[in-house]
Structures are given as C-alpha cells and as structure tokens.
Design a protein with these regions (language model features):
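A short catalytic or substrate-binding loop motif that flags glycine-/basic-rich loops and adjacent residues
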Residues: 17, 68-71, 137
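Tryptophan-centric aromatic hotspots in well-structured domains and transmembrane helices
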Residues: 1, 23, 46-49, 101-102, ...
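Short catalytic/ligand-binding loop motif for oxyanion handling, primarily in non-cytosolic enzymes
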Residues: 2-6, 53-55, 94-97
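Cysteine-nucleophile active-site neighborhood
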Residues: 1-29
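Catalytic beta-strand/loop cores that center a nucleophilic Ser/Cys/Thr
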Residues: 35-83, 88-89
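Short C-terminal domain-edge/linker segments immediately following a structured domain
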Residues: 25-28, 56-57, 75-78, 107-108, ...
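Acyltransferase
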Residues: 82, 87-180
C-alpha cells in the first residue's frame, strides 16, 4: 500500500476492523506471465487494518489489477511496464502465521475475530489447513523467472543502462502477453 501511494498517489483507508484470514481471489487478467499457471480462483492469506480501495487501483491507467477478492479487495497488481509488483496478500505466510497473529492479539486483549476460512470448523485449537502454498510458489517462481531472470541483462553495460532495462521488461511483457 505504501508503494501504491509513493508511486501513484493512491491513498489507503482504515478498515472498520482487522481483515484476517484466507480469502478466495479470482484472476482478472491472464495476459501477464506473473499469474501463469494460476487457477481461475485461488486462496491467499490476508492480514491488515487498511486497504487501498479497488476503485482507485482500477482507475489508475498505469496499473493492471491481476487478482481480486470480493471480501479482501485487490490482491495483486502490476505496473503496466512490469517493473513494479504490489501484493496486498501475504504469500510469504506459513501455516501458523495467522495463528500466531490471532493469539498475539488475544494476549493484548484486542478482541480479534477468528481469521476467516483458516481454522477447521472455526476451532482455534485445531491445526490450520495450509491451502495457499501452491499458488504462492507459482507466484514467486513466475516473478523470479519472468520479471527478474528473463528481463535482466547480464552484461554490466546493459545493467547500468536504464533505457535498455526498461525496454527488456516492456518487450518481455508484450511478447508473453500474446501467449495468453
């Protein structure tokens, strides 16, 4: 959210209560390789007190929303030039991260709600089901492969030349978008 504000002036807003849980997200745009291999809908953990309104992101001509949740809002967005990727979810979370956050907030007497779609039968004494790992691995693999490895020149002169780096990223995005 800070990056969306810094680069595009998109303000975030406070939510009425903490958004916490594992939410269903749907793919909005299959033309970019960042979500290659994703199912039409996939699960991803979210945990935050603020959000950048989806209408602001959809209205920004320099951004391409890639995935969105009805409950959690925009999940993944990329700049049109492919150089900036923003995730409002927590693909890095392991099985117990939301559990630790929930128990921490209980200890602080913050009266947190149970994370949505996380504990089996909403029972916090049971081990949470890990339902997002495959898509997280795919996301990171695609990012490294398509946006870092294939778009990075390996000669010092090219690395230092910003115009060539931009052209490589844009060319890669245009070339691969036709495959979808």
């Amino acid at each position: 959210q800070a990056g969306l504000y810094y680069y595009y002036g998109l303000d975030k807003m406070m939510l009425k209560e903490k958004l916490s849980g594992v939410y269903r997200n749907r793919v909005l745009n299959r033309k970019l390789p960042l979500i290659r291999g994703f199912d039409d809908e996939f699960l991803m953990p979210h945990s935050r007190y603020t959000e950048t309104p989806a209408a602001l992101i959809h209205g920004c001509k320099d951004l391409v929303p890639l995935a969105e949740s009805e409950e959690a809002g925009i999940m993944l967005v990329v700049s049109k030039d492919g150089r900036r990727i923003f995730s409002m979810a927590h693909a890095e979370y392991d099985r117990l991260t939301l559990d630790h956050e929930y128990k921490r907030d209980l200890e602080k007497d913050l009266r947190p709600k149970l994370p949505v779609n996380y504990y089996p039968e909403d029972d916090p004494t049971r081990e949470p089901c890990l339902s997002w790992r495959a898509h997280c691995n795919t996301l990171y693999t695609n990012w490294i492969n398509y946006y870092v490895y294939q778009a990075t020149p390996y000669q010092w002169g090219q690395i230092l030349d910003e115009k060539r780096r931009n052209a490589a990223t844009i060319n890669l995005t245009e070339r691969l978008s036709d495959d979808f």
